[in-house]
Amino acid sequence: MNPNQKIITIGSVSLTIATVCFLMQIAILATTVTLHFKQHECDSPASNQVMPCEPIIIERNITEIVYLNNTTIEKEICPEVVEYRNWSKPQCQITGFAPFSKDNSIRLSAGGDIWVTREPYVSCDPGKCYQFALGQGTTLDNKHSNGTIHDRIPHRTLLMNELGVPFHLGTKQVCVAWSSSSCHDGKAWLHVCVTGDDRNATASFIYDGRLVDSIGSWSQNILRTQESECVCINGTCTVVMTDGSASGRADTRILFIKEGKIVHISPLSGSAQHIEECSCYPRYPDVRCICRDNWKGSNRPVIDINMEDYSIDSSYVCSGLVGDTPRNDDSSSNSNCRDPNNERGNPGVKGWAFDNGDDVWMGRTINKDSRSGYETFKVIGGWSTPNSKSQVNRQVIVDNNNWSGYSGIFSVEGKSCINRCFYVELIRGRPQETRVWWTSNSIVVFCGTSGTYGTGSWPDGANINFMPI
């Protein structure tokens, strides 16, 4: 090869290398620009698909820095899109219940500023559980606590804290309410808050911290709701509300709410005669509630809510071991699945149960006449067989020498199944303990377990003689 050919060859190779390097730099620059500005295109549908017209909530936005040959590329990670809950997983199979939480509010009130409350409940968002209660507008060691046995005053508010955190002075007052229900649809909290005159109360519907809708009393006789969590499926939440006599015929309606707006109201239908203070749980694709018949029955009413067509059916828990208080002795109590048993129906107490195939898990006071003690058990055939009384897996939650109160259910979604949990209200003060002038409560919480468990009793534990009068 002569010198001229060598020069031409070397020049050609150099030009080729330079061209390749130039193209690589252009590619790197294009990649950088594309990654930086393409965040909004993540998971975009094909051009012939219709995008839903609804807001997308961004939980977090993370920037990753990747180093390529001394060139820095800032890569925007696609944000998570928050979805509505649908509760489509199966119910967890359990052997019983294990302790989960206890707030010790009354014991702490002996030496600290803790709210006077009643009607507590628990509900969870997708990541965390919260405890709620209706405050009396006062702490316990305060003269305003005198007379807090009364249910409905304009100073009552719905309190909300992380589960296990007592209602201290820094507790958030979510709304004005002497009756309430709360639930999280996967995107935000819905609070149903009832307050006002007995003959003309108002229910406010607060979603994501904003008042969205309201409804007034329809029977002018103490509009009221569940005192435990409502349930949301695919963005629609349902809550049971009653207006009318507490010991006679009343008007119960089931409301359907979408992001705080009432979208439908269904009347109660089926064989249930009286409905109060329902404890509801998701049973995909529908919702099921176990309630309190304060008129005719010590067996608990059941409401089945169809979330698609808004239809309602009702009946009674089949178990002959009935769940309300007061009630007959177990040997003489009855239930035929369809009708109230006409056994000591009035007054009653809020409670819960849930189906497990043909069986039923349930909780109730140990004392058949008053709100003392608390027990749970499963009744074989208790969901499908009239007057079934075969009891297994009994547990004592609160021994019969200590006071209990209301109880209710809440559901927690796990990786593979939906667990059922319950809380027990531990009432202290009046009317049973007349040394003091106040009425308040603490709570204890248990959740279903597939493991083994021991025994115990978890009462409130406060010495009434140590408490402010």
UniProtKB/Swiss-Prot annotation:
Substrate binds at residues 118, 152, 276-277, 292, 371. Residues 91-469 are annotated as: Head of neuraminidase. Signal peptide: none annotated. It is a single-pass type II membrane protein. Its EC number is 3.2.1.18. Residues 11-33 are annotated as: Involved in apical transport and lipid raft association. It catalyses: Hydrolysis of alpha-(2->3)-, alpha-(2->6)-, alpha-(2->8)- glycosidic linkages of terminal sialic acid residues in oligosaccharides, glycoproteins, glycolipids, colominic acid and synthetic substrates. Glycans are attached at residues 61, 69-70, 86, 146, 200, 234, 402. Disulfide bonds join 92-417, 124-129, 183-230, 232-237, 278-291, 280-289, 318-337, 421-447. Keywords: Calcium, Disulfide bond, Glycoprotein, Glycosidase, Host cell membrane, Host membrane, Hydrolase, Membrane, Metal-binding, Signal-anchor, Transmembrane, Transmembrane helix, Virion. The active site is at 151 (proton donor/acceptor), 406 (nucleophile). GO terms for molecular function: exo-alpha-sialidase activity; metal ion binding. Residues 36-88 are annotated as: Hypervariable stalk region. It is found in: Virion membrane; Host apical cell membrane. Residues 1-6 are intravirion. Inhibited by the neuraminidase inhibitors zanamivir (Relenza) and oseltamivir (Tamiflu). These drugs interfere with the release of progeny virus from infected cells and are effective against all influenza strains. Resistance to neuraminidase inhibitors is quite rare. The keyword Calcium applies. It comes from the Viruses. Residues 325-349 are annotated as: Disordered. The influenza A genome consist of 8 RNA segments. Genetic variation of hemagglutinin and/or neuraminidase genes results in the emergence of new influenza strains. The mechanism of variation can be the result of point mutations or the result of genetic reassortment between segments of two different strains. Catalyzes the removal of terminal sialic acid residues from viral and cellular glycoconjugates. Cleaves off the terminal sialic acids on the glycosylated HA during virus budding to facilitate virus release. Additionally helps virus spread through the circulation by further removing sialic acids from the cell surface. These cleavages prevent self-aggregation and ensure the efficient spread of the progeny virus from cell to cell. Otherwise, infection would be limited to one round of replication. Intact N-terminus is essential for virion morphogenesis. Possesses two apical sorting signals, one in the ectodomain, which is likely to be a glycan, and the other in the transmembrane domain. The transmembrane domain also plays a role in lipid raft association. Homotetramer. This is Neuraminidase.
